[in-house]
């Protein structure tokens, strides 16, 4: 029984994701698709529109067989660490391949780029430091460094988010010594950050444009770009909790957190670098919204994404020393199981003795500082939900067993 690994956020799960899962199984000749999915907060620092449990249900109804959670210590991170955590979890799970979307769908440039980087890693690191000193953002500086070492090759366009992530997935496979084989497929129709839904007959749209349509016009506006299960779960979540989460919902909590921190305390928060704490404390007194705060803080050096991640770490009070300690091991310390189909359950039963990290189904049965941070992130995520629903939401984190879905009878067995 072969499993293909997917690295996902499903914010929300849309038709493009369903196509991705289908192609992953076909192109890798795998019977099981295993997804490692970000929890409450995502790689760019924003909150997921709905909970990880709602997104797990969307995935299980649409071709994904196993969903595990990417711990917070990897989920809200730059591409390199996001990829390292994701790849290590899929390796722990025994996946034989990893499948990701890219701009042109050819794996060779990714493999060549990873090999070239290995040969010239010191040169690349030196150029990267020089470009950062000039005031460039990390992505821009990295792109310049990679351009230098990839001269004369079929160079990747590292200005594209999916290509950046793909490069780091392949790098993580190579550096970890995993036997997983990387595969890629070309993204179809919509670009990653397209803000508007396509006007043609396409049924594929970017998650960004779908979220925008949901917030502005409701589920009906995006329904043709979503599987039925996703539309249903989105509506059910809002009916239950009165919200689809967005960054603006957390502005008052960011403001409160900053009002209780001194500049010295703020400087110890992860991602607060180089005197940025003084700029943050000045800005928060003037800003009247999350967007205004971000516009005032953003510079060529400090990108929107980096600042957004920083704000999330401020909300969770994640200190540099704690994050560095938790990231010191080379691989993820546990596998948090969120859901599985019958086929996924059969795979896990067959592989149980071969898993290279503890499989966590109940929070009460396992303890780890990184898991404590996952729980804290879930509590922070629930802050904009009104009572008594917020308390019910928080209880679900401890009481919810992995979701089980019978793909033959098309029904959930415990959700």
Curated annotation (Swiss-Prot):
Subcellular location: Cytoplasm
Record-listed ATP binding positions: 7-20, 101, 162, 187-188
GO BP terms, alphabetized: tRNA modification
Keyword Transmembrane set for record: no
GO cellular component, one term: cytoplasm
A matching Pfam family: HIGH_NTase1
Keywords, sorted A to Z: ATP-binding, Cytoplasm, Ligase, Nucleotide-binding, RNA-binding, tRNA processing, tRNA-binding
Catalytic activity reported: cytidine(34) in elongator tRNA(Met) + acetate + ATP = N(4)-acetylcytidine(34) in elongator tRNA(Met) + AMP + diphosphate
InterPro entries in alphabetical order: Rossmann-like_a/b/a_fold, tRNA(Met)_cyd_acetate_ligase
EC code(s) of this entry: 6.3.4.-
Gene Ontology MF: a single term: tRNA binding
Lineage: superkingdom: Bacteria
Function: Catalyzes the formation of N(4)-acetylcytidine (ac(4)C) at the wobble position of elongator tRNA(Met), using acetate and ATP as substrates. First activates an acetate ion to form acetyladenylate (Ac-AMP) and then transfers the acetyl group to tRNA to form ac(4)C34.
Family of this protein: Belongs to the TmcAL family.
Annotated NCBIfam families: PRK13670.1
Protein name: tRNA(Met) cytidine acetate ligase
Native source organism of the sequence: Bacillus velezensis (strain DSM 23117 / BGSC 10A6 / LMG 26770 / FZB42) (Bacillus amyloliquefaciens subsp. plantarum)
Taxonomic path: Bacteria, Bacillati, Bacillota, Bacilli, Bacillales
């Amino acid at each position: 029984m072969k499993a293909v690994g997917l690295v996902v956020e499903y914010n929300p799960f849309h038709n493009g994701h369903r196509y991705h899962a289908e192609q992953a199984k076909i192109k890798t000749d795998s019977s099981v698709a295993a997804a490692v999915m970000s929890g409450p907060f995502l790689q760019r620092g924003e909150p997921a529109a709905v909970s990880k449990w709602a997104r797990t249900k969307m995935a299980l109804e649409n071709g994904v067989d196993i969903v595990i959670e990417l711990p917070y210590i990897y989920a809200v991170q730059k591409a390199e660490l996001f990829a390292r955590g994701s790849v290590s979890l899929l390796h722990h799970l025994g996946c034989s391949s990893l499948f990701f979307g890219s701009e042109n769908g050819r794996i060779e440039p990714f493999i060549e780029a990873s090999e070239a980087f290995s040969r010239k890693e010191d040169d690349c690191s030196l150029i990267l430091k020089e470009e950062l000193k000039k005031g460039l953002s990390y992505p821009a500086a990295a792109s310049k460094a990679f351009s230098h070492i990839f001269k004369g090759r079929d160079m990747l366009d590292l200005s594209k988010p999916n290509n950046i992530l793909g490069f780091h997935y392949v790098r993580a496979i190579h550096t970890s010594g995993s036997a997983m084989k990387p595969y890629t497929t070309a993204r179809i129709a919509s670009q990653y950050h397209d803000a508007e839904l396509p006007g043609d007959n396409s049924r594929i749209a970017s998650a960004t444009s779908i979220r925008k349509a949901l917030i502005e016009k409701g589920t009906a506006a995006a329904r043709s770009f979503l599987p039925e299960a996703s539309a249903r779960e989105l509506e059910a979540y809002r009916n239950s909790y009165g919200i689809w989460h967005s960054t603006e919902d957390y502005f008052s909590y960011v403001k409160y957190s900053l009002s209780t921190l001194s500049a010295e305390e703020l400087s110890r928060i992860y991602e607060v670098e180089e005197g940025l704490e003084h700029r943050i404390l000045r800005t928060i007194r003037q800003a009247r919204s999350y967007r205004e705060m971000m516009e005032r803080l953003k510079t060529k050096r400090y990108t929107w994404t980096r600042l957004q991640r920083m704000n999330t770490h401020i909300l969770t009070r994640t200190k540099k020393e704690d994050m560095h300690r938790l990231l010191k091991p080379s691989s993820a310390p546990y596998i948090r199981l969120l859901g599985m189909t019958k086929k996924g359950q059969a795979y896990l039963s067959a592989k149980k003795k071969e898993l290279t990290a503890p499989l966590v189904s109940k929070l009460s049965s396992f303890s780890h500082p990184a898991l404590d941070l996952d729980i804290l992130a879930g509590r922070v995520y629930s802050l904009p939900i009104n009572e008594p629903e917020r308390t019910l939401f928080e209880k679900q984190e401890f009481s919810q067993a992995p979701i089980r879905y019978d793909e033959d009878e098309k029904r959930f067995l415990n959700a």
